[in-house]
Amino acid sequence: MGFVCLFGLVVMGAWGAWGGSQATEYVLRSVIAKEVGDILRVPCMRTPADDVSWRYEAPSVIDYARIDGIFLRYHCPGLDTFLWDRHAQRAYLVNPFLFAAGFLEDLSHSVFPADTQETTTRRALYKEIRDALGSRKQAVSHAPVRAGCVNFDYSRTRRCVGRRDLRPANTTSTWEPPVSSDDEASSQSKPLATQPPVLALSNAPPRRVSPTRGRRRHTRLRRN
C-alpha cells in the first residue's frame, strides 16, 4: 500500500503547491502494479482546477504485446484509465478522454468479419463507453485553444494556462514537478519521455513563419 500513499501525495501536492492564478502543471507518474488489485486500490483522481493541467508519464518504449489489461474506472469522476504491463509490473495512467475517443473510433470499425455475437458485444461496449463520456461533459472541454497555445494533456477548461513561446527567449523559467526524490517512480531509468514544458513568459503572439520557397507548380489545362 506504500505506493498508493506516495501516488496520492504526488497528486494531492499540486492542489496546495501553488495558489492564486499562477499556471500549474504536474506529472502523473505510473504506479507499481504486480496484480490487478494494486490498480483497483489506487484512489480516484479529482478533476483538475481551472489553473491546473496534468501531464501523463509516458514510458520510453511501449510494447503493446505486453499490455495485459486496460482499466477504465467507471466509478471515478474522470474515468481514470490505466494501461497495465504485468511484465514490468507497472500501471500507466493515460488521458482518459483521448483514450476513450480512440477506443470508440476503433469499435466503430469492424476489423474482422463480424458475426452476430461479435457485433452485439462491440455495440454494447461502444454504448457503455459513449455513455460514460457523455456523463462527464463537465470534466472536459472541447473548446479550441487560441493561436500559439501549446495545450497540456488534460486541462479541464482548455484555457492556455501554459505554453511554449515559439520565439527565442533570452531567459527561461522552468517548472519542476512536486515529486520527492524517494518517489517509487524515480527508480526508473527514464521516468519521463520529455522535459517539463517551459511556463509562459509573455502573452505576445508567436512570430509568423514564412513559407518555404520552392519551385513553382504549373498546371496544364486539357482542352477537349
Curated annotation (Swiss-Prot):
Coiled-coil zones: none
Cystine bridges: 44-76, 149-160
Signal peptide boundaries: 1-16
Membrane topology of this protein: Peripheral membrane protein
GO annotation, biological process: fusion of virus membrane with host plasma membrane; symbiont entry into host cell
Residue ranges, annotated region (Interaction with gH): 20-161
Entry GO CC: host cell Golgi apparatus; host cell plasma membrane; membrane; viral envelope; virion membrane
UniProt-listed Pfam families: GlyL_C (PF12524), Herpes_UL1 (PF05259)
Skewed-composition ranges (Basic residues): 213-224
Keyword Transferase: no
Keywords annotated in UniProt: Disulfide bond, Fusion of virus membrane with host cell membrane, Fusion of virus membrane with host membrane, Glycoprotein, Host cell membrane, Host Golgi apparatus, Host membrane, Membrane, Signal, Viral envelope protein, Viral penetration into host cytoplasm, Virion, Virus entry into host cell
Domain gL alphaherpesvirus-type per the UniProt entry, residue ranges: 23-201
Subunit structure: Interacts with glycoprotein H (gH); this interaction is necessary for the correct processing and cell surface expression of gH. The heterodimer gH/gL seems to interact with gB trimers during fusion.
Job of this protein: The heterodimer glycoprotein H-glycoprotein L is required for the fusion of viral and plasma membranes leading to virus entry into the host cell. Acts as a functional inhibitor of gH and maintains gH in an inhibited form. Upon binding to host integrins, gL dissociates from gH leading to activation of the viral fusion glycoproteins gB and gH.
Family per similarity comment: Belongs to the herpesviridae glycoprotein L (gL) family. Alphaherpesvirinae gL subfamily.
Name of this protein: Envelope glycoprotein L
Biological source species: Human herpesvirus 2 (strain HG52)
Gene: gL
